[in-house]
A protein has these predicted regions:
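Active-site/binding-pocket entry motifs
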Residues: 63, 70, 81-84, 188-190, ...
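Short, hinge-like loop/turn segments at secondary-structure boundaries
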Residues: 25, 48-50, 138-142, 201, ...
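Small-residue-rich anion-binding loops in enzyme active sites
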Residues: 37, 41-57, 167-188
């Protein structure tokens, strides 16, 4: 016990846990920092027992801390409206809006359009909503993303969005909905480069590994050292697989925010993951790859693995824009469907701008 009030702060996202700490006498107050940016209504939702509506901070560090340190206005992947709340006004003309894609960008756009007074239908071809967030919630330390998916779904439904899962957005279906505006939020798909052996080697994607659809065996080679590749390696080493990785760029984890990258790199070192950089893969095999060192020009190989996992990035999945462009006065493409690779902050930021433009 100390004779002064004690305030705890640091990655608190669950009000029930904060309340427990106070009741146990471990602190007098709990401070919510980034969580208050992600969802300023946290105290009210907690008081009213509406925890399912609570949008958690997912610790992405994409728009808050970096912007603050650079002297720029902060934003938030979970709440891009922060600082722009006054812009979210009722629409002057109520429209019929069709949103295609149920990832974070699509759901956020659908909800905001509904809140502005539009009639909104959200079409998602898969049985579940979430998009890339579903996969992103599997790596170690990323479980809070599943809470973000839950809150996006709950808040969409409360706003009155007509959600249709397991429904492919064909031109015929979209036309039958008579849209005044269409938002295409179909995201991205794993990149497959025209490298010899790739189509015949039986490689799995990082997404298949993270979601349990692929059996990798004990020894695994991950091709691609960006964030997805690194998180796939963490996922596998946590399950006692022996994993190595190969990356074309000179740096592993180049697209990871510095605050998170240092922990990931320490984890790779802890599990003795071999990291070959400056390596351009020139041939795929079932048990590994041949590559060329882009610095020395020498050829080398990494072979003898039980499986090879692809994490070479993403490309936009936008096959619908051309097919739908004449079905509504406004057709807006957002997120990774517009430009890949991207991130969650860009997806929800695009969603906000699209909703305000309709």
């Amino acid at each position: 016990m100390v004779p002064v009030p004690v305030i705890l702060v640091g990655r608190f996202t669950e009000p029930q846990y904060a309340e427990l700490l106070v009741k146990q006498g471990r602190a007098d107050l709990i401070a919510f920092g980034r969580q208050s940016i992600a969802d300023p209504e946290l105290p009210n939702k907690a008081r009213n027992g509406q925890l399912e509506k609570l949008t958690p901070c997912i610790a992405c560090l994409l728009g808050c801390v970096p912007n603050m340190l650079q002297g720029r206005p902060i934003t938030c992947a979970m709440n891009p409206c922060v600082g722009r709340e006054a812009e979210l006004k009722p629409a002057e003309v109520k429209k019929n809006v069709v949103v295609i894609g149920g990832g974070p960008g699509g759901m956020y756009a659908a909800r905001l359009c509904a809140l502005r007074g539009h009639s909104v239908t959200l079409l998602e071809k898969d049985a579940e909503l979430g998009g890339h967030f579903l996969v992103a919630s599997y790596p170690p330390g990323k479980g809070e993303i599943s809470g973000a998916i839950r809150s996006f779904i709950v808040n969409c439904r409360e706003a009155g969005v007509d959600i249709r899962t397991g429904t492919e957005a064909t031109p015929e279906l979209v036309a039958s909905l008579k849209p005044d505006a269409i938002i295409i939020a179909t995201g991205s798909v794993p990149l497959r480069l025209p490298i010899p052996g790739l189509d015949s080697c039986g490689c799995s994607t990082a997404e298949d590994v993270l979601t349990g659809k692929a059996d990798t065996g004990k020894r695994v080679l991950v091709v691609g050292g960006g964030m997805v590749g690194c998180e796939c390696v963490e996922f596998l080493t946590e399950r006692e697989h022996i994993v190595d990785m190969v990356e074309m760029k000179p740096v592993i984890g180049e697209d990871i925010v510095p605050e998170a990258r240092k922990y990931i790199m320490a984890n790779l070192e802890k599990h003795k993951v071999t990291q070959r950089v400056n390596a351009r893969v020139k041939q795929f095999y079932a048990d590994g790859v041949d590559f060329t060192d882009t610095v020395t020009g020498e050829d080398a190989a990494m072979r003898g693995y039980d499986s090879v996992v692809l994490a070479m990035g993403y490309r936009s999945n936008n096959t619908l824009e051309e097919q739908l462009k004449d079905l509504a006065p406004q057709v807006i493409v957002i997120g990774e469907a517009r430009q890949a690779p991207g991130n969650s902050m860009e997806a929800t930021g695009d969603a906000l701008n699209a909703a305000l433009a309709i």
